[in-house]
């Protein structure tokens, strides 16, 4: 297999049906390719969150700076509606099909190909590494965080990182991510007293109090945004009383909502606001809050500049520096080093007939190679 061409490696990875938490041999395929290029590969296993998860850390070189590429080989289930086999990795009309082609086995293969091309000119300056997890699409408790802990215990550090998520909405070169909004989920349960709907004065209906709480939470914007972040949002995701009867006032009323928040807030500050707002409505209310990630921003600098210039040279487009979208494993890496996200076009990720353009794969390989030349060119 020629590693300077990203397509064969991408096909080999896609043919491993690595639906979270299964690895299905994907990391062995990747490690084999990296070992042929001279990388030292380490397999890190963890099972604190359930089934054992396999992760891979591979490094070429021992000196600083250490430029890392982070990604994942696990994929979401294929689901229904495919017109091709989801793990066959077939090519049709210049498009590589398969679950994980966009998110994100294609980008992993592109980075490996970029490294292979760089090595044709000699050993890189400093070190190159790959941090690849099998637990990004799942709970994300046994993946990237565990590898970062393992690195810290060894005294190894990453100096900057590219995450190969499919950041481009329409065309390669559209967008890179320099941060992400945080995400908070809240479940409210308002307690009352059940009773007959003909005698409401003998019951304590929790529904009006729940509606009052939701009105208080949603009546004003959380903020107006910042130069790099859109305004924070609160989206109601469920309202439920679990009451099929038409003549019974329920004893409980429940609601759930999700907040996507910018760097004007933290999970802790939003939880305080929620609890203070709920308290104003009175009554007995249970509040459960889960923060799956804090907001973060990597200010524009050497890494984003190198990526933007490389993308412009290859595609003619200057990527928008964005913080939109959901969370990614960059939320863990940002505690260790500057991190940006840039990969293939994400229009079909998680959809049936997921695919990427073979031409885009060649272009992304060249973008990554030019970034490596700027930041890690052989002396």
Swiss-Prot record:
GO terms under biological process:
diaminopimelate biosynthetic process; L-arginine biosynthetic process; lysine biosynthetic process via diaminopimelate
Top-rank taxon: Bacteria
Instruction: Give the keywords, sorted.
Output: Amino-acid biosynthesis, Cobalt, Diaminopimelate biosynthesis, Hydrolase, Lysine biosynthesis, Metal-binding, Zinc
Indicate yes or no for the key word Zinc.
yes
Chain residues that bind Zn(2+) 2: 103, 137, 350
Which reaction equation describes what this protein catalyses?
N-succinyl-(2S,6S)-2,6-diaminopimelate + H2O = (2S,6S)-2,6-diaminopimelate + succinate
Please list the GO terms describing molecular function.
acetylornithine deacetylase activity; cobalt ion binding; succinyl-diaminopimelate desuccinylase activity; zinc ion binding
Which pathway or pathways does this protein act in? Amino-acid biosynthesis; L-lysine biosynthesis via DAP pathway; LL-2,6-diaminopimelate from (S)-tetrahydrodipicolinate (succinylase route): step 3/3
Annotated Zn(2+) 1 binding sites? 72, 103, 165
Keyword presence, Glycoprotein: no
Q: Which EC numbers characterise this protein's activity in its record?
A: 3.5.1.18
UniProt-listed InterPro entries:
Bact_exopeptidase_dim_dom, DapE_proteobac, Peptidase_M20, Peptidase_M20_dimer, Peptidase_M20A
Q: Which Gene3D superfamilies match?
A: Zn peptidases
The coenzyme or cofactor needed here is:
Zn(2+); Co(2+)
Q: List the active site.
A: 74, 136
Details of cofactor binding? Binds 2 Zn(2+) or Co(2+) ions per subunit.
Its annotated function is as follows: Catalyzes the hydrolysis of N-succinyl-L,L-diaminopimelic acid (SDAP), forming succinate and LL-2,6-diaminopimelate (DAP), an intermediate involved in the bacterial biosynthesis of lysine and meso-diaminopimelic acid, an essential component of bacterial cell walls.
Q: Name the family the entry cites.
A: Belongs to the peptidase M20A family. DapE subfamily.
Q: How does it assemble?
A: Homodimer.
- From the Swiss-Prot or TrEMBL record, give the protein name: Succinyl-diaminopimelate desuccinylase
Organism, by scientific name, is Paramagnetospirillum magneticum (strain ATCC 700264 / AMB-1) (Magnetospirillum magneticum)
Taxonomic placement? Bacteria, Pseudomonadati, Pseudomonadota, Alphaproteobacteria, Rhodospirillales
